Every structure is written in structure tokens, then in C-alpha cells.
């Protein structure tokens, strides 16, 4: 290839996008197949034979496809699901609040027991020892 030659690029192969080439091949194959089928059915008609794919009786019982649910039913289902979700959240929040409340009552009761003191102002050891024993039992269980 000489730089002075104007036709030097014409001799090179043209760039072919593989995707485009593949899609063109597929289209070509589909049209060819469709043409073959069309000619086949034309030949059958000329010979007076019925097409193989179609049943002889037009009144054959065909299974009816289930129709999709309409907008109102879908909206009702969505509304019901939202309501169930809301109730579930509400129940979980209620349970959480009850648990927090019971824990705070327990803490207040313990605090009152641990505050008890003798007439001279010394703290009572009985409730403190019981509290420590309860803590040890909880640690052993878990």
C-alpha cells in the first residue's frame, strides 16, 4: 500500500459489528422460514388438504385462560395488605411499649428495696445480697 494510492482503504475489510451481523442473520432466517411455511400452506390448499396445525372442528372446547383481576380487586388486595402490615406494626409497637413499662416498674421496685436502710442510716444487706444472687442466677442461665 502506497500512501499516494487513493484506493488503499477500499481493499481493507469493512468493520462488521457482530451484534448487527447476528441480528441480520436471525431476521434473514425468520423471513426464510415464514416464506417456506406460507408456500407449504398454499400447496396444501391447492391439493385440497387441511392444514395440520388446525383442528377439523371449529367448535372444539378450548381451555379458557384466566383473566387477570380487575383494578378494584387489586386495589382491595393492596388495601388489605397495607392494613395487615399496619396492624402488625401497631402490635409490635404495643408489645415494645409494654416491655419498656414493665422493665421500668421492675427497676423502680429494685431501687426502693435497695434504698432501705436501718434506723441509724446504714443500708440493709439482705436486699443487696438477694439482688447479687439473682444476678448470678441470670448469668448461669444465659
Curated annotation (Swiss-Prot):
Coiled coil: 94-116
GO cellular component term of the entry, any: nucleolus
One Pfam family, short name: rRNA_processing
Keywords: Coiled coil, Nucleus, rRNA processing
Single Gene Ontology BP annotation: rRNA processing
Biased composition (Basic and acidic residues): 99-115, 131-142
Top-level lineage group: Eukaryota
InterPro entries: Fyv7/TAP26, Fyv7_fungi
Keyword Coiled coil: yes
Disordered, as annotated region: 1-23, 47-67, 99-142
Cell compartments where the protein resides: Nucleus, Nucleolus
Positions of transmembrane segments: none
Chain's role: Involved in the processing of the 20S pre-rRNA.
Family: Belongs to the FYV7 family.
Protein name as annotated: rRNA-processing protein FYV7
Organism, as annotated: Candida albicans (strain SC5314 / ATCC MYA-2876) (Yeast)
Gene designation per UniProt: FYV7
Amino acid at each position: 500500500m502506497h500512501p499516494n494510492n487513493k484506493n488503499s482503504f477500499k481493499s481493507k475489510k469493512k468493520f462488521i459489528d457482530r451484534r448487527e451481523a447476528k441480528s441480520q442473520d436471525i431476521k434473514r432466517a425468520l423471513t426464510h422460514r415464514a416464506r417456506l411455511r406460507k408456500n407449504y400452506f398454499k400447496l396444501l390448499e391447492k391439493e385440497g388438504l387441511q392444514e395440520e396445525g388446525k383442528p377439523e372442528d371449529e367448535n372444539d372446547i378450548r381451555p379458557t385462560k384466566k383473566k387477570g383481576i380487575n383494578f378494584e380487586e387489586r386495589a382491595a388486595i393492596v388495601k388489605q395488605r397495607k392494613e395487615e402490615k399496619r396492624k402488625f406494626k401497631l402490635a409490635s409497637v404495643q408489645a415494645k411499649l409494654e416491655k419498656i413499662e414493665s422493665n421500668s416498674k421492675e427497676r423502680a421496685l429494685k431501687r426502693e428495696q435497695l434504698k432501705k436502710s436501718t434506723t441509724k442510716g446504714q443500708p440493709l444487706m439482705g436486699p443487696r445480697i438477694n439482688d447479687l444472687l439473682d444476678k448470678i442466677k441470670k448469668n448461669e442461665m444465659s
